[in-house]
Curated annotation (Swiss-Prot):
<dbReference type="GO" id="GO:0003735">
    <property type="term" value="F:structural constituent of ribosome"/>
</dbReference>
<feature type="region of interest" description="Disordered">
    <location>
        <begin position="260"/>
        <end position="295"/>
    </location>
</feature>
<dbReference type="InterPro" id="IPR005706">
    <property type="entry name" value="Ribosomal_uS2_bac/mit/plastid"/>
</dbReference>
<dbReference type="GO" id="GO:0006412">
    <property type="term" value="P:translation"/>
</dbReference>
<dbReference type="InterPro" id="IPR023591">
    <property type="entry name" value="Ribosomal_uS2_flav_dom_sf"/>
</dbReference>
<keyword id="KW-0689">Ribosomal protein</keyword>
<comment type="similarity">
    <text>Belongs to the universal ribosomal protein uS2 family.</text>
</comment>
<dbReference type="InterPro" id="IPR018130">
    <property type="entry name" value="Ribosomal_uS2_CS"/>
</dbReference>
<dbReference type="GO" id="GO:0022627">
    <property type="term" value="C:cytosolic small ribosomal subunit"/>
</dbReference>
<dbReference type="InterPro" id="IPR001865">
    <property type="entry name" value="Ribosomal_uS2"/>
</dbReference>
<keyword id="KW-0687">Ribonucleoprotein</keyword>
<dbReference type="Pfam" id="PF00318">
    <property type="entry name" value="Ribosomal_S2"/>
</dbReference>
<protein>
    <recommendedName>
        <fullName>Small ribosomal subunit protein uS2</fullName>
    </recommendedName>
</protein>
Length: 295
């Protein structure tokens, strides 16, 4: 049986997941996920982050295991390349530049843009066909292709709505979240102290600005998806030695099992004493290291 990835408080702390925003920028709806404040910065409760990350990773695993499709979304500069890297690694879909309004709710228009992209690529790859165009026309086509690729490269093989949306920065990606809600697509999202966790089915309290934090999240998400893909392949009788060759096939699969929307998973309860001690000790160690560096 595949092993779903996990993360501990020390790993989250080392990646800076506990650092929220300035206390003046907080969203009161995040109060239950905040441990305290230090130097006018909110500290996120990593005990909850670890527990809720586990729930999110299991959701990703189960979605892919059932041949579901996941759409990763983050268009902020810090996350753009990382999102694409890990989505491609696990054979899933992504939007890492501008979210085009209607990407989910007006798929017919988006599909038309994808078809336009495919035609442009086909024309530009045909040397004989290009002989009928001027240099300026070819340059214009190349520019149009690159512009379309920025927005559509990660979803060009997505032929139906995703079964799960995974978001980093709910404030910036609020349009994507609203569209997912309209279509009853469940949402996994990293929520910082200035975020609104409403409409997020599987919130993960954490820093959504740090590159180290974002890379950790995406690595865990991709590993969970790959484990789900492995289980799906096994169930289909696929030779696991040839699993990599089947990743592209998973991208274009039309036989998707729709993931039933789960109820919102709110504040974790009954965190054990060992976890409390681990978190407090990790914070104290971090403070001591900071003080020794400043001495």
């Amino acid at each position: 049986m595949s092993k779903i990835p996990s993360v501990n408080i020390k790993e989250l702390l080392d990646a800076g997941v506990h650092f929220g925003h300035k206390t003046s920028r907080w969203n009161p709806k995040m109060a239950s996920y905040i441990y305290g404040e230090r130097d006018d910065v909110h500290i996120i409760d990593l005990r909850q982050s670890a527990a809720l990350m586990s729930v999110a990773l299991n959701t990703i695993y189960e979605t892919v295991k059932k041949d579901g499709k996941i759409l990763f979304v983050s268009t902020k500069i810090q996350a753009s390349d990382i999102i694409a890297e890990y989505a491609e690694k696990c054979g899933q879909y992504y939007v890492n530049h501008r979210w085009l309004g209607g990407m989910l709710t007006n798929w017919k228009t988006i599909a038309g843009s994808i078809e336009k992209l495919n035609k442009l690529e086909k024309t530009l790859e045909n040397e004989e066909a290009l002989m009928g165009y001027t240099k300026k026309e070819i340059l214009d086509m190349s520019r149009k292709k690159e512009k379309l690729l920025l927005s559509l490269a990660g979803i060009r093989n997505l032929n139906s709505k995703p079964d799960l949306l995974v978001v980093i920065d709910t404030n910036k990606e609020h349009i994507a979240i609203n569209e997912a809600v309209k279509l009853n697509v469940p949402i996994v999202a990293v929520v910082d102290t200035n975020s609104n966790p409403d409409n997020v089915n599987y919130p993960i309290p954490g820093n959504d600005d740090s590159i180290r934090s974002i890379r950790l999240y995406c690595s865990l998400f991709a590993d969970a998806a790959l484990q789900g893909l492995e289980e799906s392949m096994k169930a289909s009788g696929v030779d696991m030695g040839a699993m990599q060759e089947h990743t592209d096939k998973a991208l274009t699969s039309k036989n998707v099992s729709k993931l039933k929307q789960a109820k919102k998973f709110s504040k974790t309860k009954n965190i054990d004493e060992e976890t409390n001690t681990e978190f407090e000790q990790a914070l104290n160690d971090a403070d001591e290291n900071k003080n020794s560096d400043n001495a």
